[in-house]
């Protein structure tokens, strides 16, 4: 097995702890549970995200929700039910909601300011889709100097086709997590790996 870039740079392999982190939940929107953008494995991933959110709330972890706005009439229309956050992980009063338009949740949003205001260097990241907004937000966190942990089973994606090759959702999910784990963040299989 290859040596990761994290190992070469001497970065910690220790997952984040809930009490010393901020939780960033990305794009758990209804659009990923039905219709043209439905993801494979969204239901168990959403269950894992709900468990993660409940545990974070119990630990007093700051929570930031991120949603993508594709504009009126799109599958990401946050003014319509399709673009809203799924009820299983809906924000509570006092939990920030960041609206983004790019895969990197830090681009042209207040996420960085909210993360800094929460006062935690470490982030815990989970969301939809693994290969897109989760990957690029983990990269964004890394580039701004945060230490991130990504929860694999709370993420999901969809199958794609490229260069006459079908890429299954599990393969794409695993490939995205490998990219993240090579440099941008610690990747853990489940929330069981997180200390309180």
Functional labels for PLM-detected ranges:
Residues 25-26, 61-68, 151:
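Short beta-strand segments at enzyme active-site cores
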Residues 37-65:
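A short alpha/beta connector and helix-capping loop motif
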Residues 68-69, 128:
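Short, well-ordered beta-to-alpha junction loops that form the rim of enzyme active sites
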Residues 36, 72-74:
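Glycine-rich, proline-tolerant flexible connector loops at the mouths of alpha/beta enzymes
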Residues 1-22, 51-54, 74-196:
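Active-site-adjacent betaalpha module
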Residues 29-34:
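Short acidic, Gly/Ser-rich segments with clustered Asp/Glu that frequently serve as metal-coordination loops
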Residues 35-44, 124-130:
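Short, glycine-rich nucleotide/cofactor-binding loops
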């Amino acid at each position: 097995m290859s040596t990761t870039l994290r190992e070469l740079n001497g970065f910690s392999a220790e997952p984040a702890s809930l009490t010393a982190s901020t939780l960033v939940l990305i794009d758990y929107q209804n659009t990923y549970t039905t219709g043209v953008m439905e993801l494979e494995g969204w239901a168990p991933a959403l269950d894992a995200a709900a468990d993660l959110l409940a545990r974070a709330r119990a630990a007093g972890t700051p929570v930031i929700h991120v949603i993508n706005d594709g504009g009126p009439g799109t599958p990401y229309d946050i003014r319509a039910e399709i673009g809203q956050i799924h009820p299983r992980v809906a924000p509570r009063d006092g939990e920030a909601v960041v609206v983004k338009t790019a895969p990197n949740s830090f681009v042209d949003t207040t996420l960085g300011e909210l993360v800094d205001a929460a006062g935690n260097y470490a982030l815990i990241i989970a969301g939809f889709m693994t290969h897109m907004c989760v990957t690029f937000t983990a990269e964004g966190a890394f580039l701004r100097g945060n230490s991130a942990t990504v929860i694999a089973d709370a993420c999901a994606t969809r199958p794609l086709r490229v260069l006459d090759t079908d890429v299954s959702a599990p393969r794409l999910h695993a490939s995205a997590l490998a990219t993240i784990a090579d440099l941008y963040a610690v990747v853990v299989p489940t929330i069981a790996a997180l200390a309180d």
